[in-house]
């Protein structure tokens, strides 16, 4: 369980938001929708333990990320996967290089296993045979899906995705819908940050919880009772 209490952020002499409370249950898929410049990326960095809030605190399984044990906070950050909205990498890198880096960050995966898993993950996101491609030559959609697949190689317990649904594009929405819900069913906590939620996703998720400038949706997972599930 990730809980945030009375979160506040002050920027450029003004209050971006203050007094916000969040609760994200384990093994679930969540989507936080908010308008441009509302602080979605900043919120994810606070929840990951990367940026201390100006007010409030974040608790993981009842333990404070910012006022508690530093070792716990480091372990938490190591357990998190993160797909950023803006991806800046060496133009010379290939997709395989990206997976190699992910394997090292995940405490090491044998080369043969890494390649097999990378092939499967790329196939899952609609990019079979992409290991040799140069990242600089990928489209916006291909890049979003590639970085997502590379983070999944690590097997993170918590996956934060910033703008991945929008970046991947409309043709990939149903694939991502199934993937994120399957990850949640397998025990991964998925937290997505987007400007808007796809209409079919919103219909299936039901009423959102308003929190400051954000609306928080819990996506239904396979095996649970759902309404209006996208077809």
Language model region names:
Residues 56-67:
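Conserved ABC transporter NBD signature motif
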Residues 100, 113-130:
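Conserved ABC ATPase "signature" region
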Residues 86, 91-105:
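Q-loop/switch helix immediately C-terminal to the Walker
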